[in-house]
Amino acid sequence: MKFIDNIDINQYTDFILQNDYCTIFQSPEWTQIKDNWDFKRVGVVDDNNNLLATAQILIRKGMWYLPRGPLLDYNNIELLNYFLENLAKYARKNKAKLVKIDIPKPLNNGRLEVFNKESENLVDKNILNAFKSNKFSHRGLTMKMSDTIQPRFNAVTMLEDFPEKLPKHTKRLLKDVDKR
């Protein structure tokens, strides 16, 4: 494996679109929205130069921010450790003062009522352990919005039978749009 910082934009885009955790925050277009930030794209390649992991880093005054990144196989703890170790070295080399990471993989799934016992319900403690072993500090599994800069929870609704559950008026409006 090799850590790189000169990823071809097409290779980067192809990789993120195939990744289960791809979000707009790691897309090249996000750097156009955040045009008052600098950015870097880093990654890990195998011996055949195939991307195994990547991240788009937004940079402002020494702060490096990976919104919903890195993108990689979070079941591969060896890869995660390799990425984090090399990201830290790269950040130090480039004089970053802070590296903030909001990983895209949920550490817990469930209803809000059960989140009070989060440490017991974590989907995969290995991810947190990988970050801790690479000297990243975890802000904790807080419950209040005021404790963090980003929202802690994402509301997700399953869309099975979604069209059937819409009100009649909404269904009619959707049909009108389809006819246009």
Report the location of each language-model feature.
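Short amphipathic alpha-helix that is part of the acyltransferase structural core
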Residues: 1-28, 179-180
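Short Pro/Gly-enriched beta-strand edge/turn motifs at strand-loop
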Residues: 22-29, 36-38, 137
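Conserved donor-binding loop and adjoining core beta-sheet/short helix segment
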Residues: 31-117
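Catalytic cores of TIM-barrel enzymes
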Residues: 84, 91, 103-147
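Acyltransferase donor/substrate-recognition loop-hinge adjacent to the catalytic core
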Residues: 1-7, 123-180
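Short, solvent-exposed loop/turn elements at beta->coil junctions and helix N-caps
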Residues: 28-33, 142-144
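Short amphipathic alpha-helical segments and helix-helix/interface helices
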Residues: 13, 31, 81-84, 88, ...
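Amphipathic coiled-coil/heptad-repeat helices and related helical stalk/stem segments
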Residues: 26, 83-84, 170
